[in-house]
Amino acid sequence: MRVLLRCDGGGPLGVGHVIRSLALAEAAVDAGHEVVVAGHFEGSFLQGQLAAAPVEVAQLSAWAADGDLQPLIDLVRRLRPDVLHVDSYLAPDRLRVLVTSTGGGAGLGDEDPTSLVVSNMEDGTFGRRPADVVVDPTFGAELSARPADGTPWLLRGSRYTPVRQRVIDARRRASDDRASDHRASDHRASDDRGPDDNVGGVGQVARSVLVVMGGTDPVGLAPGAVELLARTGLALEVTAIAVGENAERVRAAAQGSRLSLNVLAPVDDLAAMMSAHDLVISAAGTSIWELCCIGVPTAVAWAVDNQREGYERVVAAGAAIGLCGPELGRYELGGDERAVDRLKRALTDPEVRARLVRAGRQIVDGLGAWRVVRTWEQALAVPSPPEIGFDPMVARPATPEDSRQLWQWRNDPVTRAGSRSSAEVSWDDHLRWFTASLTRTDRVLLVVEDPAGPAGTVRWDLVRERDGEPGGSHEWEVSITVAPERRGQNLGRPLLRAGEVALAEKTSGVTRSGGTEVHAYLAVVRIDNQSSMRLFETSAYLPDLPPDPGGFMRFRKDARVT
């Protein structure tokens, strides 16, 4: 698969569009694909990041005000990519139509566009446009309605946040409690503690703070952040990423305080630097999601309008300390005494920092780029998820009378070959399992029938929250068995659809009492079981977890995406 990534960065645009495009590039290259990154890139930091990436770089002019796509059209004609992914707020809304047009003019002319998958990155309403695949990594995006625009593949929510491999590596080195326990043990050995090092007996104060307002801090938030730190009255070692006039303002903000300040230009491995500090103050752009993924206590501000929604959601989720009050604008960090109090508490209470780490790691799990790239592969194989009409199938709850038939279906050799456990199940073991299943609140066991008789069984199991993984108590994993005598009749999708409908109906409205309302359907499939893989790929299930050592891969279908 050949992938063309279109993005711009540097100067007033910041670096976020390019950084997350590079995360996708790394994942695509790791999957064995060829990648070209095209765009207008300014500044030594971005140039260094691009030079170090395992991709070809095509330098273009920035998007023209009149939406001139000709440079991109020429590049598509020359490279003939399988996937064109665009991460830009400035591209024309009709990008997909213009790029894939076969009517001549600015389009591809005589080239066949039918195999080109157009993918688009959006942040809520910013950069929104129709495409074959739309990625909105905004935390909580899947909870809000999105206007229908004909996009067949929607990847919405923070599970699709692309982060670079160095961030994933930093996450793997960390644990949920490392931010407090490990660092606190290190600090106890320090000989230069001050009077505030054990405030109110809650534990030791954080020593080191990093201030990084994106790759370039285009609106100059760093001085206000340093001023807030100075007003806490704590003795802190502060590293601030700032250049030029902004760096001078940062130094001025620290004068007369207990801060020991070090001002640096943007660094190549920001993930390593973030991991080395007790707390980071960040803008609510790309960096905040990297911090969540790694597990670093964070205080956050919003720098530009497209960051405000993410800022509000990450603060509400308890994954970051908010420094912008509802009455404050994006540039006004220095004037809110409540922000100083919140910041001081986070710096002096290790349990506050530990809670931030735990909440953040559940928002971003580091697999977003893999999920996007795997969906591109799926979109090429399945141009769009087929519409599933009403099927003459009814799923009903299993009854004791169904026990023997389900046992026989389970022990069928073909069924066992595709199961996690391929051993035969004894009648006594099955009967105990079946009887218990009928009364469990975390399992829904269904028998699916049509006018011809029993067609199979669908079982749903509630997936409990896993350490370090997003999701949990509202996700249900499916297991499908087609009646052996009904194989070869293309019943997989009707069975699955009937099972989804029955589960949604059974759990609807029970959130208050049981907390089991469906948020997502899950499927775990052996990667060598091509029929099952195809079933879920053509039923709008998206790749969610890579194959485990046993060769089982997880798919996910969000019940809330609109």
How would you describe each model-predicted region?
Residues 128-181, 186-218:
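A nucleotide-sugar donor-handling region in carbohydrate enzymes
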Residues 201-277:
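Donor-nucleotide binding loops and adjacent catalytic segments primarily
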Residues 345, 352-366:
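A short, well-ordered alpha-helix in the C-terminal region of glycosyltransferases
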Residues 365-390:
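C-terminal alpha-helical cap of glycosyltransferases
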Residues 381-401, 560-562:
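Conserved N-terminal entry element of GNAT/NAT acetyltransferase domains
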Residues 423-485:
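Acetyl-CoA-dependent GNAT
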Residues 488-505, 533-538:
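Conserved acetyl-CoA-binding loop-helix of GNAT-fold acetyltransferases
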Residues 505-527:
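Conserved GNAT acetyl-CoA-binding A-motif
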